[in-house]
């Protein structure tokens, strides 16, 4: 009994009467009254005072911060008002009619309470009960306050009291707070009534009525939607569904998601079924709040500052949950004491103990669920912050080479920078780094965000550890500190393991970056890799990196084993030391009550210790990933917003010097002074490598400005510009040398965020010569271009990119050699109708080109560049007169309408949607054409058994799994024996135990014997458990190695169509996130699942053995388990699959932003792309958010069911107290304590396995994709010996729904013949090469080489037997040698020889070249080239070379391995005409006996060939000698030559060639 003065709080087994009167009926209600009244008054007064200023019907407004500069204006999320306004709308989530009716019921109950209190108060006054009426008076005033509050809540709908809406939520909170407090206070008096302690009939009725009315009011408010928030959700479209309005009950028990779970149970979910996010969880709101709370500096302090409220809440909830979790352990000694002596305590008191265990566990479960959900919501929000910041940084990051970060510290630096790089070149310059960016976004951001969950677990672990030690001290005295010291002694070992683990993790991430970089490079260049038959080369290269990664994973597994062993053995060691000190040094008797209470505490202590181990590991990984993100965010940013100066009258350079990097070898533009003519066509010309593209990038502010000034029309964001009367803005549009397209339709790529105007759109399509292409496409302008434009030809891509610039509202156009990929006829048409036509009225255009005769024809201003300097500039007519180079170029090349550059990007090499029969298309946009949609498919239903079997087969079959599970049963049996050993140890002195077989074994032994045996059992159990985990992880690592190899092989050898229709981001998702899941999460979860199932089965069997009556409870409890698990698993499975699918678009957005960052910045369109990223993040966050809610839904219910198991076990024990000994009861309760956690762990791990298995499904899906059909007849070693090629009736289409790319094509090429293939863009020229290389399956027909059907030749043998110079000049990360001769088949002399032949180095004696390489001091005046030696670094994609130089290197690669057949696909389009002529001469002289098929737009390149093949609409229209065709006025070839503008030269060259061959 505890006393306070003369009033005891507790009398034997119940609350004392004076305590009830003083505290329950007076002081506590007075506190509720005062706090509620003060809070309500303050809120109502504030709302009334601000009644004219508050607008509750508006979306949230965020005050802008920042320095007001242009960079801030472009990238600050606070400026994205369009995301709140025009691009979305607020949807009102109104309260239901029933909810409104509930308020009237609530008011009626309050009036009833007032009536009851008035009646009882009047009765007390009549009886003159002074003390009583004080409490009742306070409670009556409290109900009057609540009546006022409900009245204000009811009248808020009136127009006269609209101001009340501002405080409606606060008034609702006062009501809920009061009802909950009053109901809580009524519980103990109600118990007193039930156990008969209160005899007064009026008081009994009052207490019962008070309790149930309070309960009714509490349930009314708990199940009604929370008032005060009308505009709860922000949605992107009207079809987006809103979740149910939040209720207290729904929030606390996570019942808000019930409808979604039931829906998932009934049928499969789709994206349309996923509810929208709360406005506070929208990415724009998260980022706006984060930006306002952040300061410049490191990311970690800003994260802590932003999430401080979440951390404080988690801290409080962890404290409450941790303390309440120990209530059962505190009550356990009293229950065991009752079992030991049932007469020592009353039944009422013991039942109170058991009920308190139930209530405390329910409250602890609720607090824990809320704390974890706060962490999971924080995880989503932090992930949003990190991904958005990384994406924004990607748009701000400089394209220059000096932006290298620690992500690639060991990457070798490149040599002289690219002077003619284009849009894609800056991207590819750092492609290795860019692929690392993908890891930063997809892996590091996720790992860091998971730390939000870790924080709660860490707090809980600390609180639980401290609480457990305090209770142990109260139970065992100072001996508990001995165990504490042992615990502390293990911490340095843990940190030692953590340090090694962190180092291995950092090393692994570096290798992961390298691996994904290699995979990304392979995917981006897959067509060229297949042409070169280099699949195995890249396979081995990537596998070698993967092997290093696997070795580190195994090292991490070993460290994890040691760490796991330390912490798993910890409780045994601590308990053994504590017990030994307790017995030996304190001379105390260790009773079952003390021992098993301590053991329950040690068992509980195992959880926080395990959490500490895993938390340390996770935090180390998170900090490493955070540092990687910080390194990326610290990278150099573009300085364009600082160096560009705005001018309305000047557009150009003033004595400007620019460079790519601060290095002596870096290419520089020197003393550039150009004033481009406004409203005119300005042309920039110069030889290959002169710096034309660099000049344009300098004008865009992308290069380092060393001196001088750059003047542009504007540096403001596109959204901030005013539209003029002519419909244009003072902005710039950029069309890069390499066409950059986004995944979407043709219309999406052309309109590109502008307002759609059909007339303008049609005019642009026509002027860019796209109208006929659109008509030939089944879906018209709704045709999906594929990833980066894969479904289009290179010329189509280039024209679409040009159309985007023309369609834009920009008054200033910057076009980088945008006509190089189209035929002469198309080029001339575009130049005349587009660049010099009505679409350019009032616009300033700057264009670069090698086609001097074409661009000078109608240009108003001409700039001649050479070696980074302006040699001359002025009107074309003036320069032609004074400049011999121009006169010679024009005389030699006349008006050739072909240009200098072919498409670089890997996507442009694909020629998938070719022009078929125009009559078969439809030009009407309004027609709902069938669009071939390549959306990612989602598996439905449960994870198929085939997926589990597929994974098990890699482990060795289901037998191995059975053996593994059986070992878990044996190991946990050993663990349980520890408790039974302790029981027999404690019972050895009792008479009841002397008849047992165990007693006869242990009789006569000392406590040391028992203690050592206890330790040995624990050590064996810990070692076996940890060893099993280690074996599982090591085995899993070996399995993932095989799976990765299978996946990589499947992707590399897949048909090219798979790569054409599958976005790279989607494939990379398999290799990054999905593979990471299998590497590090799946197997540990499988192991944890098997162990937890075994533990639960043991516990149920044990409880059922000791108390068979428990089985009556077990049946309905198991039914409950099954029900909630079934509901959850179906929902979580569907949500996880949608989550996996919705992440891919974020990968795609990143990939597109990296590729097109220069174009995006040039268009000043950063805000729109940031907004798109936020929409994609929200779509990804929605299933992720509700998946986490569903996880807490099941966790809460499993915890409650587990609490019922503990409760029912306790009831069974006290009911059988006279039949049980305390030791057995202690074992029973100790295991019952751990049952809840174990059962929860089963559900969580099983659901995790189900969810993680979706990654296995996704990887399995990509391991089953069709591979290229391989031949089975190996030809002779010298095949092809002569080089005869024949195509017979060949038809080819790239997809079942597309037009034929080749339609019944037949022609024959004799050995040694050189054939030029010509035709307009999309005619099917490149499809001939695709057919010969078997890149696509033919519909019908045959191709024979030396009379052998190539369909039966093994693919690698076929492709290695043919030389090819592809349209895409693709180079790979490495050196000059590795790009030319990756298999080391040729000598340095041979390599230098071909470099000299293609003009990359000047003529020089081969011995001189080698000598100069070996003697750095030796200098040859003849050797002036960019290639210092064959080990010179080549960046991925050849980004540190100009476009022309890349083409020359590819030409050299093909000539080095020249075969009897060579296929050339526009290989010289991006070099100047003089170099082209030299190369053509080299080809003719060095390959006289080689069969050559050349696709060319430059007719001069093939005019002296043996044959010309004219293609049109996929058909062979003409095939004869050039002179024969050009002599016939009715031929297509004659028309092409006429349109080229150099007919006389072509005719003369053809005649000379014809005469020479006669």
Swiss-Prot record:
Residues 311-621, 961-1251 form the ABC transmembrane type-1 domain. One of its GO terms (molecular function) is ATP binding. Residues 892-901 have a biased composition (Polar residues). It comes from the Eukaryota. SUPFAM superfamilies: ABC transporter transmembrane region, P-loop containing nucleoside triphosphate hydrolases. PROSITE patterns: ABC_TM1F (PS50929), ABC_TRANSPORTER_1 (PS00211), ABC_TRANSPORTER_2 (PS50893). It is a multi-pass membrane protein. ATP binds at residues 686-693, 1319-1326. Residues 410-434, 892-926 are annotated as: Disordered. It is found in: Membrane. CDD domains: ABC_6TM_VMR1_D1_like, ABC_6TM_VMR1_D2_like, ABCC_NFT1. Residues 424-434 have a biased composition (Basic and acidic residues). Pfam families: ABC_membrane, ABC_tran. Its main location: membrane. Disulfide bonds: none annotated. InterPro entries: AAA+_ATPase, ABC1_TM_dom, ABC1_TM_sf, ABC_transporter-like_ATP-bd, ABC_transporter-like_CS, ABC_transporter_C-like, P-loop_NTPase. Residues 1-29, 125-130, 191-201, 324-351, 471-481, 580-584, 975-1013, 1106-1109, 1221-1222 are extracellular. Residues 51-103, 152-169, 223-302, 375-449, 505-558, 606-953, 1035-1082, 1133-1199, 1244-1558 are cytoplasmic. Glycans are attached at residue 4. One of its GO terms (cellular component) is fungal-type vacuole membrane. Coiled coil: none annotated. Belongs to the ABC transporter superfamily. ABCC family. Conjugate transporter (TC 3.A.1.208) subfamily. This is ABC transporter NFT1. It comes from Saccharomyces cerevisiae (strain Lalvin EC1118 / Prise de mousse). The lineage of its organism: Eukaryota, Fungi, Dikarya, Ascomycota, Saccharomycotina.
């Amino acid at each position: 009994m505890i006393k306070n003065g003369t009033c005891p709080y507790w009398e034997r087994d119940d609350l004392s009467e004076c305590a009830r009167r003083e505290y329950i009926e007076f002081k506590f209600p007075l506190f509720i009254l005062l706090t509620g009244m003060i809070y309500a008054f303050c809120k109502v007064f504030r709302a009334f005072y601000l009644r004219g200023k508050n607008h509750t019907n508006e979306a949230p407004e965020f005050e802008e911060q920042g320095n007001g500069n242009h960079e801030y204006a472009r990238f600050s999320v606070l400026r994205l008002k369009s995301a709140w306004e025009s691009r979305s709308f607020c949807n009102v989530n109104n309260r239901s009619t029933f909810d409104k009716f509930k308020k009237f019921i609530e008011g009626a109950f309050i009036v009833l309470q007032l009536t009851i209190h008035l009646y009882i108060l009047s009765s007390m006054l009549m009886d003159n009960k002074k003390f009583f009426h004080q409490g009742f008076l306070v409670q009556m005033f409290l109900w009057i306050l609540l009546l006022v509050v409900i009245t204000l809540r009811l009248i808020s709908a009136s127009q006269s009291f609209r101001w009340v809406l501002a405080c409606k939520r606060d008034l609702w909170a006062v009501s809920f707070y009061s009802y909950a407090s009053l109901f809580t206070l009524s519980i103990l008096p109600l118990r007193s009534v039930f156990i008969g302690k209160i005899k007064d009939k009026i008081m009994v009725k009052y207490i019962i009525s008070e309790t149930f009315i309070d309960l009714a009011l509490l349930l009314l408010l708990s199940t009604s939607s929370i008032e005060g928030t009308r505009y709860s959700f922000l949605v992107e479209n009207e079809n987006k569904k809103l979740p149910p309005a939040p209720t207290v009950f729904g929030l606390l028990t996570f019942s808000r998601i019930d409808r979604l779970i039931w829906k998932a149970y009934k049928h499969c979910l789709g994206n349309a079924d996923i509810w929208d996010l709360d406005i506070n969880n929208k990415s724009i709101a998260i980022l706006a709040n984060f930006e306002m709370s952040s300061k410049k500096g490191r990311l970690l302090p800003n994260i802590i500052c932003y999430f401080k409220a979440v951390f404080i809440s988690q801290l409080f909830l962890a404290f409450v949950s941790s303390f309440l979790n120990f209530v059962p352990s505190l009550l356990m000694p009293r229950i065991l004491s009752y079992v030991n002596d049932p007469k020592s305590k009353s039944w009422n008191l013991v039942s109170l103990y058991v009920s308190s265990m139930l209530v405390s566990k329910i409250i602890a479960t609720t607090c824990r669920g809320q704390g974890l959900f706060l962490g999971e919501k924080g995880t989503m929000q932090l992930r949003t912050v990190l991904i958005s910041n990384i994406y924004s940084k990607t748009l701000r990051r400089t394209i220059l080479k000096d932006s290298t970060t620690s992500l690639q510290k060991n990457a070798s630096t490149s040599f002289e920078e690219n002077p003619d790089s284009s849009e894609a070149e800056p991207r590819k310059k750092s492609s290795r780094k860019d692929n690392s960016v993908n890891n930063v976004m997809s892996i590091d951001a996720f790992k860091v965000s998971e730390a939000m969950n870790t924080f709660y677990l860490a707090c809980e672990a600390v609180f639980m550890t401290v609480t457990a030690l305090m209770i142990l001290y109260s139970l065992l005295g100072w001996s508990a500190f001995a165990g504490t010291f042992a615990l502390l002694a293990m911490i340095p070992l843990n940190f030692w393991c953590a340090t090694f683990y962190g180092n291995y993790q950092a090393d692994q991430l570096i290798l992961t970056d390298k691996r994904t970089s290699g995979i990304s490079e392979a995917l981006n260049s897959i067509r060229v890799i297949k042409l070169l038959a280099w699949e195995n080369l890249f396979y081995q290269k990537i596998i070698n990196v993967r092997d290093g990664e696997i070795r580190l994973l195994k090292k991490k597994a070993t460290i994890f084993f040691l760490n796991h062993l330390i912490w798993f053995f910890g409780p045994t060691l601590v308990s053994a030391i504590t017990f030994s000190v307790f017995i030996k040094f304190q001379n105390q008797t260790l009773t079952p009550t003390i021992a098993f209470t301590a053991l329950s505490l040690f068992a509980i202590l195992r959880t926080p210790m395990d959490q500490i181990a895993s938390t340390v590991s996770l935090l180390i990984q998170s900090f490493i990933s955070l540092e990687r993100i910080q390194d990326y965010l610290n990278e150099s940013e573009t300085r364009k917003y600082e160096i560009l100066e705005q001018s309305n009258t000047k557009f150009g350079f003033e004595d400007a010097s620019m460079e790519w990097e601060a290095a002596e070898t870096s290419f520089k533009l020197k003393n550039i002074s150009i004033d481009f003519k406004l409203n005119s066509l300005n042309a920039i010309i110069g030889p290959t490598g002169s710096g034309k593209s660099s000049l344009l990038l300098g004008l865009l502010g992308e290069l380092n400005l060393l001196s001088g000034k750059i003047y542009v029309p504007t540096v403001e964001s596109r959204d901030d510009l005013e539209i003029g009367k002519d419909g244009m803005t003072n902005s710039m549009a950029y069309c890069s040398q390499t066409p950059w397209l986004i995944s979407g339709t043709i219309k999406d790529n052309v309109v590109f965020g502008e307002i759609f105007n059909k007339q303008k759109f049609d005019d642009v399509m026509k002027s860019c010569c796209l109208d006929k292409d659109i008509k030939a496409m089944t879906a018209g302008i709704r045709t999906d271009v594929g990833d980066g434009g894969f479904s289009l030809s290179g010329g189509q891509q280039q024209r679409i990119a040009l159309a985007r610039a023309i369609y834009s509202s920009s008054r200033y156009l910057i076009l980088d050699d945008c006509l190089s990929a189209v035929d002469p006829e198309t080029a001339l048409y575009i130049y005349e109708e587009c660049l010099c036509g009505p679409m350019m009225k009032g616009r300033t255009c700057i264009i670069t080109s090698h086609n001097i005769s074409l661009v000078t024809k109608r240009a108003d201003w001409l700039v001649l560049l050479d070696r980074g300097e302006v040699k001359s500039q002025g009107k074309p007519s003036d320069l032609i007169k004074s400049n011999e180079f121009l006169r010679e170029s024009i005389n030699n090349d006349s008006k050739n309408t072909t240009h200098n550059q072919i498409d670089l990007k890997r996507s442009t090499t694909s020629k998938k949607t070719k022009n078929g029969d125009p009559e078969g298309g439809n030009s009407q946009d309004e027609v709902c054409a069938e669009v071939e949609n390549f959306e990612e498919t989602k598996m439905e239903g449960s994870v198929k058994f085939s997926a589990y079997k597929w994974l098990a087969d890699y482990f060795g079959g289901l037998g191995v799994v059975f053996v593994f599970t059986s070992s878990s049963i044996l190991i946990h049996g050993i663990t349980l024996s520890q408790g039974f050993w302790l029981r027999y140890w404690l019972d050895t002195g009792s008479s009841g135990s002397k008849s047992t077989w165990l007693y006869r074994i242990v009789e006569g032994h000392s406590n040391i014997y028992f203690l050592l045996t206890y330790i040995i059992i624990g050590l064996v159990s810990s070692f076996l458990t940890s060893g099993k985990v280690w074996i599982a992880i090591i085995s899993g690592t070996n399995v993932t190695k095989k799976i990765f190899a299978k996946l990589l092989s499947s992707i590399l050898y897949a048909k090219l169509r798979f790569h054409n229709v599958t976005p790279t981001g989607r494939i990379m998702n398999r290799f990054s996130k999905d593979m990471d899941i299998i590497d590090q999460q799946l197997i540990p979860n499988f192991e944890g699942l098997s162990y937890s199932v075994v533990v639960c089965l043991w516990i149920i069997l044990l409880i059922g053995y000791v108390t068979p009556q428990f089985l009556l409870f077990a049946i309905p409890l198991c039914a409950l388990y099954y029900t909630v698990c079934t509901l959850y698993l179906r929902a979580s499975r569907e949500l996880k699959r949608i989550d996996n699918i919705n992440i891919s678009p974020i990968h795609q957005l990143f990939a597109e932003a990296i590729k097109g960052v220069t174009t995006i910045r040039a268009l000043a369109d950063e805000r729109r792309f940031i907004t798109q990223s936020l929409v994609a993040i929200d779509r990804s966050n929605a299933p992720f958010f509700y998946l986490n809610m569903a996880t807490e839904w099941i966790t809460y219910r499993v915890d409650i069911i587990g609490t019922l198991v503990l409760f029912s076990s306790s009831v069974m024990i006290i009911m059988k107290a006279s039949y049980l000994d305390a030791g057995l009861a202690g074992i029973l309760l100790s295991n019952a304590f751990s049952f809840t956690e174990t059962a929860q762990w089963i559900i969580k791990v099983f659901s995790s396995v189900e969810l993680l298995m979706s990654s296995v499904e996704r990887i399995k899906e990509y391991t089953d994709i069709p591979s290229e059909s391989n031949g089975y007849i190996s030809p002779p070693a010298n095949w092809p010996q002569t080089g005869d090629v024949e195509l017979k009736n060949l038809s080819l289409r790239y997809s079942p729904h597309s037009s034929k790319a080749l339609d019944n094509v037949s022609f024959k090429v004799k050995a040694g013949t050189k054939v030029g293939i010509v035709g307009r863009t999309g005619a099917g020229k490149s499809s001939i090469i695709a057919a010969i290389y078997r890149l696509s399956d033919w519909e019908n027909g045959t191709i024979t080489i030396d009379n052998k059907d190539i369909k039966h030749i093994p693919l690698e043998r076929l492709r290695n037997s043919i030389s090819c110079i592809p349209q895409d000049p693709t180079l790979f990360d490495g050196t000059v040698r590795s790009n030319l001769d990756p298999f080391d088949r040729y000598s340095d002399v041979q390599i230098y020889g071909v470099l000299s032949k293609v003009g990359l180095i000047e003529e020089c004696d081969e011995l001189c070249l080698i000598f100069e390489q070996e003697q750095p001091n030796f200098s040859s005046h003849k050797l002036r080239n960019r290639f210092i030696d064959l080990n010179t670094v080549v960046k991925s994609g050849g980004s540190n070379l100009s476009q022309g130089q890349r083409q020359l290197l590819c030409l050299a690669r093909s000539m080095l391995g020249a075969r009897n057949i060579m296929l050339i696909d526009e290989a010289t389009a991006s070099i100047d005409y003089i170099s082209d002529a030299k190369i053509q001469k080299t080809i003719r002289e060095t390959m006289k006996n080689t069969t050559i098929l050349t696709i060319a737009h430059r007719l001069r390149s093939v005019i002296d060939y043996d044959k010309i093949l004219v293609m049109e609409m996929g058909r062979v229209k003409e095939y004869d000698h050039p002179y024969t065709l050009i002599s016939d006025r009715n031929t297509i070839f004659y028309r092409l030559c006429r349109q080229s503008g150099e007919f006389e030269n072509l005719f003369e060259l053809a005649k000379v060639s014809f005469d020479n061959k006669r």
